[in-house]
């Protein structure tokens, strides 16, 4: 394994439910304490560490006497609310024993989608890291209304890595790493020691494994690595049961699969746009506009738009799609959806005549547009 982890100064560590719970029946305090011992060792090396930890729902289920994961949203939220108390307590106790302060940070997609809240969250986390505190992060499951998670904690880990400009994301799981096929089904499956994050071949290889307690599978980890690569963070997917896995990784030992961020780092504002999971709408563009955006780095003009979908307002992040529906970019809309429909396929010189005013000549300016 390369020196990516050895040289990393700021690391986001994500641990899955199976590594911090007793097979889904409440938290495994001994396991969490072992992780905290390793986190403390990393801090003593001069590194900054953020922990993204699952386990709240499993702990809540135990405290409520539930043996199976509920399906109703309000029951999942109730379990999360109960379990967050225990999760925070265990981490606080274990980190305090190592001489470290801890902070619980609960995030939602809305916190990351709103630019001002995003910047506030970033400022808070960077301040905590500067104080030598270990933030322990989870989705604020109790107040999420559309679904119980951002998607999963793998995705949350990648979003946090981008939020704090981490050098590396470590995803610790109950699997050794990434294989060319599902090793449980294919005896010829080859272990992948190192690859480039974001390559289509990786997504094709990934299976859909997942347990009854957690929600993640290998595909979510592949996509998380792709997302983290946007801000320059490489990702390691490793088996969390390896003894001293974190310490061995930062020593350069070849544990797990390393997915290297090889693409140019995206500017912070554009990374924020790329990280949006829920978009208010989209526009389809003709082939000429597609070439201008993709190959020449131009702005999106109304004349290149052939269809407007959704209900968005000025300043919302929207997707830009090819005529085949493939997302090629996203950016901040200069006009609301109803306005965009009126000016679509029209030259910019006609905007004022059609709307009675003209905010901008572009539907999306190139400074507010990122290719995906």
Curated annotation (Swiss-Prot):
Compartment(s) of residence: Cytoplasm
Highest rank taxon of the organism: Bacteria
One GO MF term: RNA binding
Involved pathway(s): Amino-acid biosynthesis; L-proline biosynthesis; L-glutamate 5-semialdehyde from L-glutamate: step 1/2
EC number(s) on file: 2.7.2.11
GO biological process, one term: L-proline biosynthetic process
The PUA domain, residue ranges: 280-358
Binding site for ATP: 14, 173-174
One CC-aspect GO term: cytosol
The reaction(s) this protein catalyses: L-glutamate + ATP = L-glutamyl 5-phosphate + ADP
Keywords linked to the UniProt accession: Amino-acid biosynthesis, ATP-binding, Cytoplasm, Kinase, Nucleotide-binding, Proline biosynthesis, Transferase
Gene3D superfamilies registered for this protein in UniProt: Acetylglutamate kinase-like, PUA domain
Protein family according to the UniProt entry: Belongs to the glutamate 5-kinase family.
Designated name of the protein: Glutamate 5-kinase
């Amino acid at each position: 394994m390369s020196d990516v982890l050895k040289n990393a100064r700021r690391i986001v560590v994500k641990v899955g439910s199976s590594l911090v719970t007793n097979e889904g029946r409440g938290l495994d305090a001994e396991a969490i304490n072992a992780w905290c011992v390793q986190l403390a060792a990393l801090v003593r090396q001069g590194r900054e560490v953020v922990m993204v930890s699952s386990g709240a729902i499993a702990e809540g289920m135990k405290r409520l006497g539930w043996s199976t994961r509920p399906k109703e949203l309000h029951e999942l939220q109730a379990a999360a609310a109960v379990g967050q108390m225990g999760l925070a307590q265990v981490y606080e106790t274990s980190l305090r024993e190592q001489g470290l302060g801890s902070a619980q940070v609960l995030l939602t997609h809305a916190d990351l989608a709103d630019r001002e809240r995003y910047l506030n969250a970033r400022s808070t986390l960077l301040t905590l890291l500067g104080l030598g505190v270990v933030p322990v992060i989870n989705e604020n499951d109790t107040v999420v209304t559309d679904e119980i998670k951002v998607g999963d904690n793998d995705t949350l880990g990648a979003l946090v890595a981008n939020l704090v400009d981490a050098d590396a994301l470590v995803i610790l799981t109950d699997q050794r790493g990434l294989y060319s096929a599902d090793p449980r089904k294919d005896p010829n499956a080859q272990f992948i020691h190192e690859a480039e994050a974001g390559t289509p071949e990786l997504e094709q290889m990934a299976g859909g494994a997942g347990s009854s307690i957690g929600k993640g599978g290998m595909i979510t980890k592949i996509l998380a690595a792709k997302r983290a690569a946007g801000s320059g963070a490489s990702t390691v997917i490793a088996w969390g049961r390896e003894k001293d896995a974190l310490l061995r990784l930062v020593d350069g030992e070849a544990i797990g699969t390393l997915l290297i961020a090889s693409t140019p780092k995206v500017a912070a504002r554009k990374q924020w746009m790329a990280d949006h999971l829920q978009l208010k709408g989209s526009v389809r563009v003709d082939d000429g506009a597609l070439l201008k955006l993709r190959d020449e780095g131009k702005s999106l003009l109304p004349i290149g738009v052939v269809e407007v979908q959704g209900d968005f307002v000025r300043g919302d992040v929207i997707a830009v799609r090819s005529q085949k529906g493939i997302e090629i970019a996203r950016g901040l809309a200069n006009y609301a959806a109803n306005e965009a429909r009126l000016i679509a396929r029209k030259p910019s010189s006609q905007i004022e005549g059609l709307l009675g005013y003209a905010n901008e000549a572009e539907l999306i300016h190139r400074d507010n547009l990122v290719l995906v």
